[in-house]
């Protein structure tokens, strides 16, 4: 939504997650200049890549424009470091959106249809069948590669916004099967810290999954 600056009501700013987190205005060249400056700062210090949060919201509820902004940032960073690696978080199962994001040229996106407690990895382990996983994987890989021939899908079980895998898979053999499944899926495998131990959600504080 939109909020007024508490010190100057004539200034209105967009903030979709919190009124203390104003959105970047990617239509303003000054914003891009500062983004490029920040990226160069870290690249010059040896950073090999970036994990980009919530790329679908660069323009709120407009993934086509978000993809354009993502392409600008990716191309800008490539000029500084040709082999830079970027992985984006786009919490969506809509293949129109996923492929639009990949058309930005970004190296990788987290594959959300496979993660979380309702994703294909855990569902396959719990059901004892990989048919749905296999069908979804073949389709997902095909469509993403058509959008970006260099796409490297990033697979995971859960992340910091989800309940931990240990909550759903209570048996050790199930946890091992889930790990084997996503670790051997073509692409990049991301392990949320604690998953290698079978950690469960510790329900204390404001963010128990952490």
List where the protein language model places each region.
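Active-site rim elements
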Residues: 22-28, 58-60, 164-173, 179
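Substrate-binding/active-site clefts of carbohydrate-active enzymes
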Residues: 1-45, 69, 73-79, 83, ...
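Active-site-proximal helices and loops of the catalytic beta/alpha 8
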Residues: 51-149, 153, 171-172, 180-184, ...
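Hydrophobic (often cysteine-bearing) scaffold residues that line and stabilize catalytic clefts
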Residues: 31, 66, 190
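Ligand-binding/active-site lining segments
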Residues: 156-157
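Short acidic/polar active-site loop segments enriched in Thr and Asp
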Residues: 48, 189
